[in-house]
Amino acid sequence: MRYTSFLTFLSLFSIAFAVDPRYCQSKTTLDGKDFTLEEIDTPHLPALAKYFGSKGKITSVTAVLQSANRDLIKRSPPLSNGDGPPAESWAWNSGDDKTTEWIPQGITSSADAFGKGTWNDHEVWIVSWYRKGESVRVSFIDRKTNKYRHVMLVYPTADDDFESISIHAGGIAWYGNVLYVVDTNKGIRAFDLDNIWEVDIAAGVGKTKDGKGYSADEYRYVLPQMRHYNWIAGDASPFRFSWISLDRSDSPDTLMVGEFVRDGETFEDPNKTPVPIRYVKYNLDADTRRLQTNDGIATASWAYCVNIPNVQGAVSYDSKFYISRSTGRAPKKGDLFIWEEGKTATEHTGWFSAGNEDMSYNLVRKEYYTVTEYDQDRHILAYKV
């Protein structure tokens, strides 16, 4: 009896994979209605914002840039035949280049924030870093001065407290006053760039022990979460929010998210069902800077299966996709794929230096960006289209 029940369970488990409309199973085009996110505002943000406002401790992106306390270093990655020659290449200061505590992942620019390409006349990059199991910081970089400053991401847990955020932050996208950050298993988080808070430069995160102030592990500024978009299907039909990018050629503008899946990776079901690799787009509201929703639900406008494993980031513009695939540490290189729907992708093997990650596209400069993750070999790279 138990044996029969077990066989029945395995059979149902296999059927569940086979009939899930979100999985590829020899398909390429998927139905966007099956990829939904629930919008949830952060309940304790207004009270904390009111407090920091009353203390004169709300600052701006411009002020963060003007207070930048670290310098990028002009440095080219090691190149060989077949590599894509970057138009620009920058390294972090020595401490950030060498640290194994923090690992860079995502990149976006002021050209994502606004179509004109600048934020208050500043050309800016933002790069995300994660500290495994602990926290996330983002670097605000002024492209004119080549100076930068780190800011910690936080989640308000009460009307008078906040905590660090322990996610991978594999991709980011800046849209108006919102910084979108992927949360691998849960969806997309949104952070309020109109509410950057100045805190005490002291140990600990959140309310200080004496209850008289706030701190963020010695960082001067924190960026609070304003809302999140939860993957409604959950673990019953998982989607990996590995990277994210903005497409201004779509109408309306869209956010595209995609999955990092290892070559040959399968689910742990009896049939060893291949883990799908999907790219999904969500429409944006240019006025509110939110995802477009109906009764609090964001539904994908486009979903597609793209059979390229180990992808760390991608951008799309005018129906052309530029895709960043990593292959490991040096001497290995990263690959660039250029793809259009219904066509075979063009592969540029070894195009990137090792550790290529998330991507961002700058319509004004006609260039795309990536950031490399491995310690002592970290770069921000710009390539002309």
Segments the model singles out, each with a brief description of its role:
Residues 1-19:
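Fungal secretory targeting signals
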Residues 30-134:
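Beta-strand-rich domains and repeat architectures in extracellular enzymes and scaffolds
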Residues 64-100, 146-163, 203-238, 286-307:
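Surface-exposed loop and turn segments in beta-propeller and other repeat-based domains
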Residues 97-121, 165-175, 235-254, 307, ...:
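Structural signature of eukaryotic scaffold interfaces centered on beta-propeller domains
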Residues 112, 123, 254-357:
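Loop/turn-rich, solvent-exposed surfaces of beta-rich toroidal or solenoidal domains
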Residues 112, 128-132, 184-185, 193, ...:
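Short loop/turn segments immediately following the C-termini of beta-strands
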Residues 135-146, 192-212, 269-289, 333-343, ...:
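Beta-propeller blade signature
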Residues 357-385:
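Blade-level signature of beta-propeller repeat domains, shared across WD40, Kelch, NHL, RCC1
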